[in-house]
UniProtKB/Swiss-Prot annotation:
Keyword Ion transport annotated: no
Pfam families in the record: Ig_3
Organism: Rattus norvegicus
Protein name: Microfibril-associated glycoprotein 3
One GO cellular component term noted in the UniProt record for this chain: plasma membrane
SMART domains (UniProt xref): IG (SM00409), IGc2 (SM00408)
Subcellular location: Cell membrane
Polar residues biased stretches: 311-331
Cystine crosslinks: C68-C117
Keyword flag Cell membrane: yes
UniProt topological domain (Cytoplasmic) ranges: 161-347
Amino acid sequence: MKLHYCLCILLVVTFVPTALVLEDVTPLGTNQSSYNASFLSSFELSAGSYSGDDVIIAKEGTNVSLECLLTVDHYGEVHWYNSKGRQLHSRGGKWLVSDNFLNITSVAFDDRGLYTCIITSPTRASYSVTLRVIFTSGDMSVYYMVVCLIAFTITLILNVTRLCLMSTHLRKTEKAINEFFRTEGAEKLQKAFEIAKRIPIITSAKTLELAKVTQFKTMEFARYIEELARSVPLPPLILNCRAFVEEMFEAVRVDDPDDMGERIKERPALDAQSGIYVINPELGRSNSPGGDSDDGSLSEQGQEIAVQVSVHLQSETKSIGTDSQDSSHFSPPSDPASAEGSTHHRE
């Protein structure tokens, strides 16, 4: 906040209590005039009384003179009436009528109101004057003045304290900005954060320059953190994780789940399918030497042999083949003559 704004606030706070104290006072018109007529020495218009067109304002306890502005005959009489309609006589005391003036001694707050003067010659006419009295006595007025004075004092102290705090804040902010432009490296970013807390008081030019420098330093800090993260040593397995996973998938090929399901369903059916196949008796014997040496076997009729066949998967077939090869290596064939004898015995 600028200094002249603070001064305006101080002026407003200074004059508001005064206006509240004088709230019963009506501003006078532009045609204010003072009556220089010759009054009695004891009823001269006091310094606390003011006169306007038809309004007279006086403080409580002062003497007031009201003038009737009607043209009065030399032998005519003027009659004065108060706001209650009671005629005021000049028999001494508080009221005193002299020619066309009404003099009031020690005006009280109850004397306020409209006063009317009436003449009967040369013509009947009337003229009214309003009297307003400023209430200055009593406990309430003193209490009100004390309250206003205390409020004004507190407000003034708060405003002065605020000005001092703002001045201190501005000095600290200026010092922080100067230190920001003098520092380099990581400390400059820290100074930028300190200045950011005081942003509302910074001028526009310095704010723009500070924003540019802060943005550049923030990006530089981000790059520094990124390089620092890359320089941290990590295990080779974590660094080569993607290559390791790709090699693993190439080594172990995963089939389609749908095809695997179909194969699992077909496997029991293949295992269950078994049948008896008849060998054609017209098939000739093999061209083995053993067959040619056996002349009697050519004249014999063929016989049907029942063979049970089962279907296995490729992997099972390979395992069976391996087992049969192993057994053939460890069990050599028997004597040909004994083999032929057993054949004839079965026939």
